[in-house]
């Protein structure tokens, strides 16, 4: 199991690397996020690569990042992935982001083109949260048909306060599936009687999709939103129930 160490648009990659080093010191495997907009250029990236080597980190995730404007030469994840290949590295696993339900600022056509351009520069995909299992299923089938054969880790929200989840989901552009979520009477009832969201029903819906097991589904990436204890308990309990 890897712990994802995200990259704050205000604190930057250096803070991500510092926290990664502390977690490694406590025995964890980490996947730091190297957000392209938070890297100033090739010299900065080269320093990051050297630090990754020093810490023995073998896995990173390359998103665009949440900065309004890039701090340097890399406008998007593709730019940084190309620079990584040019500079060379000892990484075994490089991840890229995907948005099954789209992105508020980018068309679906552009998103798919970007995936196709990045597929040879990355080793795995992590999706943004999606609350509509059918949309997720259809997207997984589509990328499989387009020859994108990378393993896909589907993003699931962890156990989190409902209000915080709704706020975050609307910010990152999963509003359509939230509207779908509200229409489902079983889930809506659950939300009404509890202020805490639990991903059990969503996980069940995903596993019941007809086609998803014929795609490159590798597993699940849990977005815990710093609700580590409750989410880890849910994860452990869910795995125990399957054994």
Language-model-detected regions and their locations in the chain:
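Conserved, mostly hydrophobic/aromatic
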Residues: 32, 118-121, 154, 206, ...
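Non-catalytic positions within long, well-ordered alpha-helices that form the structural scaffold/packing
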Residues: 24, 53, 118-119, 144
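Active-site glycine- and acidic-residue-rich loops that bind
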Residues: 39-43, 68-76, 127-140, 162, ...
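Short catalytic-loop micro-motif centered on adjacent basic/acidic residues
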Residues: 4-6, 32-34, 124-129, 219-222
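Active-site beta->alpha loop and helix N-cap motifs at the rims of alpha/beta catalytic domains
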Residues: 1-110
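Charge-patterned, long linear interaction tracts outside catalytic cores
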Residues: 118, 213, 217-233
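Active-site glycine-rich loop that binds ribose-phosphate moieties when present
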Residues: 105-120, 125, 135
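Active-site pocket-lining/capping segments in soluble small-molecule metabolic enzymes
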Residues: 73-100, 147-211, 226, 239-243
